[in-house]
């Protein structure tokens, strides 16, 4: 498995083409599985179930309609995006619910290293924080797609993005719960390096090499 880490913001259209090409390579056996860690300039993406009414302001940043699962979400600086391109068949994970559960687990284990108690919320994909009397907020979104059981797209974890940029959408189509970040929780993760190190360790522990 190859790990690719980009320090600078990546062009979104280029990233789609890169993922699609790597998926083809994994399917035909000419390329290795890949976990790609990156970030984008500010933009919005809409998944296959996105409702146009959830896009409240289409003029603020570029909007891309893509083939991943899910609705509208935001990407931008301070958010770590992770795209695992895995052969799920060879890993005996031919079950999207199981795959998403495992991705959530990787994020939960990673965030625990920073003192963030992430959890799942029944009926909603992603990783959430806040329990008891506190309304839960999403700290990590997940939207995936598979082609011949090779996965792509993936995870977006909010470390220190500008959360006001979410105001132009209804994130993931959920009106009753908000979004948060490590920074909003009072936890400074100013360098992606530490997050990446813990994420890789957690990912390998759960998915293997």
Curated annotation (Swiss-Prot):
The answer to keyword Transferase applying to this record is yes
Q: What is its EC number?
A: 2.3.1.181
Q: Which InterPro entries match?
A: aa-tRNA-synth_II/BPL/LPL, BPL_LPL_catalytic, Octanoyltransferase, Octanoyltransferase_CS
List UniProt keywords, sorted A-Z. Acyltransferase, Cytoplasm, Transferase
Main EC class of this protein? transferase
What are the annotated GO cellular component locations? cytoplasm
Please give a single GO biological process term from the UniProt record: protein modification process
Binding residues annotated for substrate, in chain numbering: 68-75, 141-143, 154-156
PANTHER family, per database record: LIPOYLTRANSFERASE 2, MITOCHONDRIAL-RELATED, OCTANOYLTRANSFERASE
Regarding protein family, the annotation reads:
Belongs to the LipB family.
Name under which the protein is recorded: Octanoyltransferase
């Amino acid at each position: 498995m190859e790990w690719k880490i980009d320090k600078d913001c990546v062009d979104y259209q280029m990233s789609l083409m890169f993922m699609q090409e790597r998926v083809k390579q994994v399917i035909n056996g000419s390329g290795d599985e890949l976990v790609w860690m990156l970030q984008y300039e500010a933009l919005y993406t809409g998944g296959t179930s996105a409702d146009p009414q959830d896009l409240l302001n289409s003029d603020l940043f570029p909007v891309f309609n893509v083939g991943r699962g899910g609705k509208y979400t935001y990407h931008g600086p301070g958010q770590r995006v992770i795209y695992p391109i895995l052969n799920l068949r060879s890993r005996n994970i031919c079950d999207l619910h199981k795959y998403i559960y495992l991705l959530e687990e990787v994020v939960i284990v990673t965030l625990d290293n920073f003192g963030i108690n992430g959890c799942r919320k029944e009926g909603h994909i992603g990783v959430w924080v806040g329990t008891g009397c506190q309304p839960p907020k999403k700290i990590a979104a997940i939207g995936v797609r598979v082609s011949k059981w090779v996965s792509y797209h993936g995870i977006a974890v909010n470390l220190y993005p500008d959360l006001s940029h979410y105001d132009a959408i209804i994130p993931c189509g959920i009106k009753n719960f908000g979004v948060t970040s490590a920074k909003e929780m009072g936890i400074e993760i100013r360098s992606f390096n530490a997050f990446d190190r813990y994420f890789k360790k957690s990912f390998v522990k759960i998915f293997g090499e």
